[in-house]
């Protein structure tokens, strides 16, 4: 029963695989493939198949359990399913022969039979023999599967005879076939079935295979199966066929041809491979690893099938290839990304076509590496190439690897970039050309559509080249520009017509009649018509403008952030805050004044004498003054000391003040120069603010040997210099005494120093002042128009650069306070800076003592706004007009600027206001001296202005004279004249430093109120207030006339008839008196009588006014009025420092407006105003104005007391522009007459040597020219260096040689050259203008001028030759007479100036301009010689001719035809060109007598 229940065991067969075996001699160097055949059948998976099996074993391996000392291997068993579904188990035995690895002979075994007999054995026995897997198993049996041969014995059921049909293995096929034949014979004896397996058919040799088939065909039932263990082809078929032969029930064996079986197997592999590759394609991250992926796929059937067929190694290789492809794809994308971003990088680093157009690729690479943005676009990797670094994984780093640029692709992109730039340049050029074409089409108006214009440009080349989108874009841009420009011009036109809008009160609404009037006036303007197609926009702009005019605020200002009010507030907020910080530091450094350090400056031993006198009056250097003891540290320095500047200021000695003592014109001139240098250097270096504020005191020494001879001259000169320098002047006390210095002088000077120091401490006190406005002596409003083309700091610099400037009352963000000496006292002046639109409310509602009206000479609208504002200002209020432009040259080169500046001066002349020009390129005008005369005028009229203001506001009596402001509690002492440091960084001429800065000189009309000092300077008459001809009140006391003294005959620089001239000048009264009695001539008067004595010497102790005059008996019955001004308003007189001489006259009429005083203003207003004024008609207004002003003009002569001197400091290159009143015809006639008389009295010309500008000793500068050159180097080294520097770096500098360079830089250049002749100017970082100034200074310092004095007359005569060619040849012959050294240098300099003039379109320096700048330097004129004044223009034209005709004079070239060849100037009537007694300069551009017809006495022309 049990047996029946047991399942039947599947049949089991043992197959023995046999074939050629033995030593290498028998079988060759490889086997016939028995082991591979067994391996592939038993373990068919690719990972379990081992292609290498060895038969050479060691004794140990041979004796191991796997081989077990047998010459056969047990491969295990495999269960196989037949086609009928019946299973069978097949045990596989391989019969082989193992070779000893020592002897290379077969191992000795228990069976000693040869292989042929052993292989044919049907019974095999080996106890505990293990299954063989691979060679590595031997010796390591425990690491592999251990499976024993069943029961240690097996019976062989069939044989599989292997025959190798491949080539090679160093054996002959015939020998193998012979061996096989013998083996087959033995196998046949066993009566077991045999099948031949043709192995290695994948490397089959057909001939061998045919022999095998032939061999088999000769045998009965011997089948041949073609196999390949490598590709697993027909392996299973061999064993299946053998089993079928053993078991007849399984059917007949089916042998498949090799090729068919191979194809079937390969198809199976390809299908599995495709499925596996698709499986691998699901992996997209090239960072994935095989281990991770295989673990995820190990259960997938496609994965398992491929692993079985191809193995893990191939699967890994397939995966690796896929990962590599992913990586390469990623790299490719990154490369494409980099290549695509290269154009953008090139555009960033190499945007300029001109720079790279001619560069090759390598040069472009080097250029890119130098760019600052290189690191933003490219990254230089430490390792290359870039695609093998981790940079490929930095997705967020978009920088391009620099080594990528070494590829051809990158170079191609660069070439494309260059071509793109070329094409883009062409496209832009065409767009711009098209734009210019549109600009040339005049009929294109703002707002015109493109369709109306397109038909006119269809044939244009540029239009055809660019695209339609480009053409529309260009036209749209053109339309925007012309519309914006038209709107700006329309707005500017509205400002130019400011008089049309500013006639209504603020916050008013314009009526329909007014609007109609506005449209009527404006409709005639082309700028109004230009916006015809944009009428709504035009109306909007007009209404916006009107709305702003009638409701002006800085928030709604049409200039936006460029509103003057906003800019002023911002500037003052920062500037005043910085001043406060500086004051705090200065205050803490200057509080101790128990010890006084005094610097005493003098000439010819005067300083030491004064120091000795002070020590005589001291006790152990302690000086008693006003009950206090001061320790004095005196440091006298003589003018001849070479280290005078270095001695002034040291770390150990910081002076509190400087006593400047003089007793002659020379010593006074030296003092003026020295103080100017100190202040200039202090302001430029700004190393110590205290040095800038150093107080100076001028002390006049007594002259024991010539008492009263030239004392008046020195007194006048000293007082004038003190006024200019804003410092005290200590006069010689009255009476006679034997010593040079009086104790009272020393005490007065010391008090002045102490008071100055005390005042400076008050000014710089860290406690904010912010005093109430009521404490201000004067309130000035400065007006400027919004949007003018200059910065507000330019017009405010005269105030902000002054140390006496401080903040105004808290809350007043647009005001500042000035402490300034006006008259004889220090005054507090409030300056309020406003826009014109903000000033209108101030003009109507607040008290203003004076207006400073600023306008741009480049802008008509600025002048229009000024006219509109000025027209409504009361004529009692003084006005200062200020025209602002870039440089002096603008007046000569720009007609529009010339017209506006002329109009400004013309208006100023008509209303008797002051006028000045301010240049942004000039430093000199940035000083408060610009407004000093204006402040004096305002202070003089203060009471009249306040009374008029009260009269208008309270409607009280016009005779009311009470001051609006409370009198200032401050009391000013006579010696409280403190200097303004920053204001005087450059003292007025003649004390300004050498340079090209424009200087303010009074016009001839202004000089009628002045006398000329010994230096050619004008100064007010001593002790006389600064009154003007144009005042309405003519009851002015005459000037005090000091008693004349007989001068010494040897006084330098005096005209022969000095005494008579002085007396005549002092005796003249330029004012019109109330009496009609004619004045006596000066020569008819007794020189010892008729001189008014100042009453301060008599009534000072009684508290009377300083300006009361006592009149002696007058033998000529001349009437001189005496006014006792303390009768009315004594307190106001004391406050102002002037007599109230105007209040009475002005109290008799109601003030008018300036538009009724100016024909220009009224004509403008009349053209606008259509309605009738309520008070009077236009004619009545003019008649009234004329009647009140009739007869107030009277010409006044200048007093030619002294000859001008040192005019090379007077700004020859830049003539001053300053005038403040009208000029009389008689004056010009008198001057012309005087010049003719002076020519008759001319004297022999003397050699003139100006003093050197240097303040240090030099062994080079100032030396004779012959000492500085050699035959090898005929040009001085310094001249060569300067010229080379200028021509290398500055030929195109605007204003070269005209614009002044920094004087400190000029001095440093010469000092450095003194120390080292090999200096490099470029390394000094100095400006071209500084080098140009140093070059001019070199020639100015030469002992003799470059053009010798001896040849001046010949040059003058040659220049008068009418014929141009003859004149040039005559000049050429004269030049040949130069000393050889002078000739070489002169040729070098003129050649250089010719090169400069060739760039005149850029640097604006024509030959004419250069000659103006250079001829005084080259010819060294003697301005003391009046005869010379009439020939200045001729000398200048000579130098201009040399520059223009440089090639002709020096290089035998042809005469150059110039557009403005200078003709010889007329020799007659020189007075029409140059005024006598005026420092040489170009004709003043803004003086009415030179640029416009002479004004009549009545400018309105009513009579």
UniProtKB/Swiss-Prot annotation:
It comes from Mus musculus. Residues 1036-1045 have a biased composition (Pro residues). This is Rho GTPase-activating protein 5. The gene is Arhgap5. GTPase-activating protein for Rho family members. Residues 779-944 form the pG2 pseudoGTPase domain. Residues 1263-1450 form the Rho-GAP domain. Residues 267-325, 366-420, 427-481, 482-548 form the FF domain. May interact with RASA1/p120GAP. SUPFAM superfamilies: FF domain (SSF81698), GTPase activation domain, GAP (SSF48350), P-loop containing nucleoside triphosphate hydrolases (SSF52540).
